[in-house]
Amino acid sequence: MIPPEIRRSVLLQKAIKLALAGTLLTFASFSATAADPSSDTETPQPPDILLGPLFNDVQNAKLFPDQKTFADAIPNSDPLMILADYRMQRNQSGFDLRHFVDVNFTLPKAGEKYVPPAGQSLREHIDGLWPVLTRSTKNVEKWDSLLPLPESYVVPGGRFREIYYWDSYFTMLGLAESGHWDKVADMVANFGYEIDAWGHIPNGNRTYYLSRSQPPFFAFMIELLAQHEGDDALKEYLPQLQKEYAYWMEGVETLQPGQQNQRVVKLEDGSVLNRYWDDRDTPRPESWVEDIATAKSNPNRPATEIYRDLRSAAASGWDFSSRWMDNPQQLSTIRTTTIVPVDLNALLYQLEKTLARASAAAGDRAEASQYDALANARQKAIEMHLWNNKEGWYADYDLQNNKIRDQLTAAALFPLYVNAAAKDRAVKVAAAAQAHLLQPGGLATTSVKSGQQWDAPNGWAPLQWVAAEGLQNYGQDDVAMEVTWRFLTNVQHTYDREKKLVEKYDVSSTGTGGGGGEYPLQDGFGWTNGVTLKMLDLICPQEKPCDSVPSTRPASLSATPTKTPSAATQ
């Protein structure tokens, strides 16, 4: 475990903005070890900056089916020397770019295909996967895009060879359900380390993910750990919770009504809410060619604007969805940064409530009251600006047109999940979700078929869990059971047929993995494993747990959420 003094070290924000703005700076090597997040450590540069024209040429040549492959490749020597060699050789007769890459880089190894023992139940399969998906990267190669972490961690699986921020919370739910509290503690420690090192939790532990975060679930992770360790977990990680909050709220003190700065927005009435934002406005290294093609398809918009909105959608976790687009069939109409997301603000409400609880646990009642006041102000802003009264559901706010958006998405359940919804509105959301999103195989992400992976007909494990728990918070147990039972049936049928759990599911039926998006369907899969275990224990009583989904639907869920309802639910 990381010593508390390292966890609590107060670090200055790194010079990330300059390094990640796209300027090719002289490379300063950094200690590729997770021993100490020292403030003297330079922010490591992503491969598109390190390798400049070489990176661009390799990605545009499409040497690899997945653009993430070269983004994850490790230079075998100083990148500046490789780049100099490239500039000298590339115009020579017979130059072979693929051979040059093979000589100068170590490509990521293809993961060994896991073959589970025959006859395993769903629970046995998941329990057997935890060690398969566990990684340890305390030390990495000098120029690796992988960022070292002090403790072991569980990855999602497939092409996702690193830890991911919001994925990890749902993975942790399963680890806790399996009794692996040591792994939960290790992963929380890693995220605390990242906050100390970088000022925030990046999208994943790669240099090219440092310019953005993801849905802020760190507070939920601390609350989960506190179920096992008590208030000590809250007190121990209070400094990191405060730093994460500072990251999301950076610049709020200088905003005038109607202005935005990075991740924070002040509306005309003075309400403060947040949006997703990436500090860079260039193509994503892991999807370089795709982003360039998207920008070129809409010459009426500046390419940098499109790149920023693509990156910010990646920060949202919903990459990509009609939710962020003017035209669901045209990705280049994406404008994530002009949308105030309801789910993000619900999560930040939870962060403020957890900060209040942690401050109280640490004995600082005055600070606890301040965080409670911030949470109450955000809750009022959610009710004022993120409720669509005409449609009867929570939705996103459109900064460009100064109005609430009409689209219903699974994000509408997040205010229920964090107990921030008014009771009468929660009932309306439950009815809307049941009428428009509930499908034979679970809850659809949206009702729009755009070909993007965060749209119909796909359903995702984390959104099933948020919906089921949120609905239970407000006594909507019948709808919660339908979401839980239908999704579990989908997972079970797919497992019966393919002997694996996957990243996303087609919820228009049962037994089929989802499609769409930038890459093939991935298996593993961290958050599906975690949510499946939790749901198995929801539908089966504690005295008679089930290892697979039973053949007949139970009359009711066997457990209820343990969160204490906020004043909004009274």
UniProtKB/Swiss-Prot annotation:
Record's catalysed reaction(s): alpha,alpha-trehalose + H2O = alpha-D-glucose + beta-D-glucose
Region: Disordered, residue numbers: 544-570
Binding site for substrate: 159, 166-167, 203, 212-214, 284-286, 317, 518
Any GO molecular function: alpha,alpha-trehalase activity
Low complexity compositional bias, start-end: 554-570
Pfam families per UniProt: Trehalase
Compartments it resides in: Periplasm
Coiled-coil regions listed in the entry: none
The protein's role, per its UniProt record: Provides the cells with the ability to utilize trehalose at high osmolarity by splitting it into glucose molecules that can subsequently be taken up by the phosphotransferase-mediated uptake system.
Protein name (record): Periplasmic trehalase
Species this protein is from: Salmonella schwarzengrund (strain CVM19633)
